Amino acid sequence: MPESLANAVAAAAADQAALRSSQLATIFAETGTLASAIPGYRPRAAQEKMSEAVANAIADNDTVIVEAGTGTGKTYAYLVPAMLWGGKVILSTGTKNLQDQLYLRDIPTVRHALNVPISVSLLKGRANYVCHYHLERAQANGRLASKQDAAWLREISRFAKTTTSGDKAELAEVPENAPVWQIVTSTRDNCLGSECPNYKECFVMRARKEAQQADLVVVNHHLFFADVVLRDTGMAELLPAANTVIFDEAHQLPETATLFFGETLSTSQLLELARDTVAEGLSHARDAVDWVALGAPLERAARDLRLAFGRENARLALGQIDADPRIREPFHETLDALDTALSDFVEALESQAERAEELEQCHRRALELAQRLAAWRDDRIAASPVPAAVPPAADAEGDQSSQSSQSVQPAQLGPETVRWVEVFSHTVQLHRTPLSIAPIFSRQRAGQARAWVFTSATLSVKGNFTHYAAQLGLDRDRSLTLPSPFDYAKQVLLYVPRDMPPPQSPQFTEAVVERALPLIEAAGGRTFLLCTTLRAVQKASDMLYDLFAERGINLPLLVQGQASRTELLDRFRELGNAVLVGSQSFWEGVDVRGEALSLVIIDKLPFAPPDDPVLAARMEVLQKKGLSPFAVHQLPHAVITLKQGAGRLIRSETDRGVLAICDTRLVEKPYGRQIWQSLPPFTRTREADTVIRFLEGLGRGEAPQSESSTESE
């Protein structure tokens, strides 16, 4: 390009950028477009700055990473330029809760304020929509586990006749985690597709069609990556047409992408296959074969694989299994038996598949699972470092079909993968996981020019995006850090107790509860106690039950597992003086504003266990490259996770409270400084009396006081 033409192009681009900046200034001004249309709206400089960065990325088909602190108003900051200039936009969130909030509240608000005629669609995974075919089958079958399930089935049947979306979130009468949903929704494996007699009325297909026609489509990360891998979510037609892709809660992307770019085979899938085949066989070809006898060997082999592991929960690298004779022989023997049973099942089903489309679908599923098992067993490339020990119990079984049927072709995974086994109470999952998703994700982003926006409140370590960008193969220089408008020094006291035992000590959780109890009393409840393991949740809650009874402390105690997360949070807000003890699922995506939450206690720094199979393999690769696994991976990951947990406390300018971190490594280890400097600038203390006075004074509107023992950054 001649220099004169290049200069003209650059000048035109600069003029366009200035025009966009002027438009955004008008929209976000104190008396601007948003303020005129949205009651209570207040301008924030960081919000306008982020909006400009997003607008520029859209204009240049560029990538931008934005860490926007809590209270910045990042949702409006990306929605405004997306609606004005984004073209076809895909907006992906970390949770279905945020997905619903955006679709039902935030997007309509901004669309109305801007007065732009854009169409919006909400697209979820197929497990969120009632399936007419499976609903009819469940009603005809009539075999339900309880009267409650039967009542819920009647509610779902009435709902299916009146709803236009089929989205189970709209049916408040049936809990979203009710077991009955599993039999009235479809999976990728058991969907009949265009051969289904109810295809024209299918809620999933209707949602996908609406998404194809919409200007802005709201999805979640699981759906986005499931499509990238499976082309089975309706996104296959969406992504090529998209001009802009925005990831909110983008800190979750590395973990979600790793899940979907790997391969997983679960015994639950095999049991479901056997049961579906028996049901379809009895329905369409009852006299052809003994269907129960056909499915029995596969069911037995799948259960035997679980019985090969004595422990309830474990995450074991294949190398670790092979190094332990107590597990090695039972595992490989039952795996051989499963391989044989699945092969026999495929062969027997082949001759019956032509009798009905439903049986043909079962045959295709069986073939795919057999191929996946063979690929897992024959992988000679994957390294399987032997971790030091078996990690603590997993947080949840989570063996959902939406997460267990993903598969990337082996060539896509690359040479650096790890094979490992995850054992739950009732199922076993065989995983093959890429140690780096950066090259895979980079390939997915290559090709058609479009804008990519990654945003969250927690993406950096002290403003450095190296760790996050490296995980996804992004350019760390195309990033922006925007601080929260909150006055953290006045709103929050950060407390690290003295004289705590080491985090690995058997007495550690007991010490945490002992230090926490006087703070809980001073706060009048209103507490989150966040633990890094489920084992700690159980021990801490048991101790608190006993101590509350012993000392006559009349505070409601809510514990993870008693009910769904949504139910527990609703009860916590309603009670106003509760203590909630939870693990990983409460570290993020939880918003409790006001006086209901004044104290967040974190038991220890959230370092991933070094005996985790995937982490162990990643650490080995880093060591071979001459890098420090701790500095490059473990520490940045812990910082970002801790920032998420700490972010539960302050959700508005009027919130005030105490963040207690009971891990003295935060102040006693050299790396501790890097961790707390990555947190907002809280006032800090190590004196329990200071904390108790502050908590007792919250009702009097007192701010944290600087003392000789208190530091302010």
Predicted regions, residues:
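A substrate-engagement module of RecA-like helicase motors
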Residues: P2-A37, G87-D215, H222-F225, T277-L282, ...
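Conserved pre-motif I regulatory segment
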Residues: A14-V66
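Walker A/P-loop NTP-binding motif
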Residues: A55-N56, T75-K88, R105-T109
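Signature of the SF2 helicase/ATPase Hel1-core->accessory helical subdomain module
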Residues: L84, D100, R188-N190, E195-D339, ...
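Conserved RecA-like ASCE P-loop NTPase motor core of nucleic-acid helicases/translocases
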Residues: V89-N97, F454-T455, G525-T532, A536, ...
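A contiguous, basic/glycine-rich beta-loop/short-helix subdomain that forms a polymer-engagement track
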Residues: Q182-V217, V228-M235, D344-V390, A394-G398, ...
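Conserved RecA-like P-loop NTPase helicase motor core
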Residues: P485, P497-Q507, Q560-V667
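Conserved helicase motor "Helicase C" RecA-like lobe of SF1/SF2 P-loop NTPases
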Residues: T532-G561
